[in-house]
Amino acid sequence: MTRLTVSVTTEKMRLSKPFRISGYVFEAFDVVVVTLGDGQYQGRGEAGGVYYLGDDTAHMLSVLDKALDAIAAGPTREELRSILPPGGARNAVDCALWELEAARAGIPVWQLAGQAAPKPLRTTFTLGADEPALMAETARGYAQARSIKIKLTGELDLDLARVAAVRAARPDAWLGVDGNQGFVAGQLDALIAGLLAQDVGLLEQPLARGREADLDGLRSPIPLAGDESILSLADVAPSVGRYNVVNIKLDKCGGLTEGLLMAQEARRLGLGVMVGNMGGSSLAMGPSFVLGQVCDIVDLDGPIFLANDRRPGVEYVDGNVWSGPEVWGGKA
């Protein structure tokens, strides 16, 4: 087994303007970049961690530092799942291992994953929570978007006004909403009724993680997606009967390897599959784009919020996202 060189760096990603969700306002965020090399080839992975779990750069660096020798030993991607827990640190290393393995084999990652040649994916464009008129203006500005995701804050009347304003501005677009854990069970009936009136196609994570039992018996005509409730593979099966869609994010689950396993398990259980992101540059979107090839809903718009993305970067055309092999994952 060839020992690997392991480079771990941090970078600050600044947003072009503040971005608000339920309970948080983001102006910038830090990422960890892991580069693995064998003297001839290298692989890269970027992770932003999971802010609501305390999985920030300091935590990721600590996790990586404790496992550096095991990582340098050149584990397989499956072995890595036993070395590092789910989270940003494993995500960065796992994605680097994928790119390194593909480079060694002389094939792109999608081929290594057993997929057909990738296609552009229709992605959502996200609206941060703001005043309804401002959100409507932003929605009109997303001229190419065919799918829009609206961030809500748990303020029921204001949230429904936000959705109504966006729907009036974009009657042509598919709309989904994301509660980011901001609602309580007693609000759900009124929330769902209001969303139905605006032809909303997805309700994501309305209740807090840990309150999943409050969804028992709920019969929502709008599909419910679990995000914070479904972190890794172990959370997929318990979501049956409560959620209809699993939102997979590589920073949560620990990389493309686990993400693909989650998608496979969700399909086996009759659940829909969504790929999302915790923000990040195009380097973080590349692996998620591979996962997106097997998903029903794609939310990979993170780079559009950055003041400066990496180059080469993912492309957004006609409401679709495209991540070429030059961004991450090897030669075509």
Where are these regions (language model features)?
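Active-site cofactor/co-catalyst pockets and adjacent glycine-rich loops in catalytic enzymes
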Residues: 303
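N-terminal capping/lid subdomain adjacent to the active-site entrance of alpha/beta enzymes
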Residues: 1-175, 182-186, 193-196, 310-332
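Catalytic core of soluble alpha/beta enzymes
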Residues: 150, 155-293, 307-319
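Short helix/strand-capping turn motifs
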Residues: 296-299
